[in-house]
Amino acid sequence: AAINDIIVPLMTEKHHSVNHVFAAHPELLPMSKSTFYKYIDLGILNVKNIDLQRKVRYRVKKEYDYTRAKTKDNGIKLGRFYRDFQDFLEHNPNASIVEMDTVIGTQGGKGGKCFLTLLFRFFNLMVIKVLPYRRSIHVTEVFEKLKESLGDEEFSRLFQIIITDNGSEFSDPESIEISTKTGEKLSSVFYCDPNSSWQKGCIEKNHQYIRYILPKGTSFAGISQQDADVIASHINSTPRLVLNNQSPYEAAIGFIGKDSMDLLGIQRIDNDDVDLSIRILNR
């Protein structure tokens, strides 16, 4: 009865995963996860397979042939290819890695409001910034604000390495890397090989959490930065199996620190208050 009364609503209404409810309520689930799934299949619980968070599969891509790199890549991307990223990591194995991407709403291309996502790879912690358009000037504006609020030293510590794709919105890496105050290089931007999104697979997988709240086809037109911070806070408060059932917030707080976490717009949400549905934007 307790499972149907407490656990099932968390899964069907707030989109909690099986791992999330097992991490948050072990006292109510005296069985293995495989048994829990079996109970669902047998119809013992008031939850159906369609209510479960989807599992995402990724294909392994073949290695990129750098000898075929387009001439235009040899400008801004010289020294920033994925192989350069790998070389940098060999010499800086403990560097903080941030994966960067964009998520669009109903309007594709550069035509409307979208999200800039920044994911701290070691912790699966995702920052979400609202862009009015998917253009490099607006990406630059986000990073100028981050440098201003965090300060150059803290920005450099947190964003030591940034790995992203070949989208035109990321075509001005120096504006991301360089301090607007001193001209000093604070970060290093690298690019994935073409058609190799798996090289920043952590952020690709984390985007599924955004889609639980804002399914594909949902307009971002009415989404404010405050809304994006709320979305990020709920996502980052969701326990992850890969983090030994810690949430990204719990895993990252020791490294990022409370002050910087606040400046990044992320707050901790209690386990049972985590809601991965659009209702969180109507509160």
At which residue positions do the language-model features occur?
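Secondary-structure boundary/capping micro-motif
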Residues: 1-205, 209-219, 223-224, 230-233, ...
